[in-house]
Amino acid sequence: MIQMQSILEVADNSGARKVMCIKVLGGSHHMVAKLGDVIVVSVKEAIPGGKVKKGDVYKGVIVRTKTGVVRPDGSTIKFDKNALVLLNKQDEPIGTRVFGPVTRELRTKKYVRIMSLAEEVL
């Protein structure tokens, strides 16, 4: 579960490496974000020459969490690190590649584009 001040890794090639959650979107009582939720983040670490710069504010969709997700058949998928994909103003991915695996639950959240860019879908 991701909350304000959580540090996440960026799973795309937008140029950002680490971001910090500054707001969880989705209502006034929405305190934590789960897999597939959209959050507002600030870039804390970026590579030189990337599309984004340190201090920029973007939206991002969470693609991997340490707490994981429980499937209807009872199985659980957990990851080692929390990761997200940065989105532009039109809610499209900024990067052209997504590194690492993503889960099928993104399809129900209408992020099929991220699934098609990903290396592996679990």
Swiss-Prot record:
Q: What does this protein do?
A: Binds to 23S rRNA. Forms part of two intersubunit bridges in the 70S ribosome.
Which PROSITE patterns does this chain map to? RIBOSOMAL_L14 (PS00049)
Instruction: Give the gene that encodes this protein.
Output: rplN
In alphabetical order, the GO MF annotations are: large ribosomal subunit rRNA binding; structural constituent of ribosome
Q: What is this protein called?
A: Large ribosomal subunit protein uL14
A cellular component annotation (GO) from this entry: cytosolic large ribosomal subunit
GO BP of this protein: translation
Transmembrane helix as a keyword?
no
**Family that this chain belongs to:** Belongs to the universal ribosomal protein uL14 family.
User: What InterPro entries has UniProt attached to this entry?
Assistant: Ribosomal_uL14, Ribosomal_uL14_bac-type, Ribosomal_uL14_CS, Ribosomal_uL14_sf
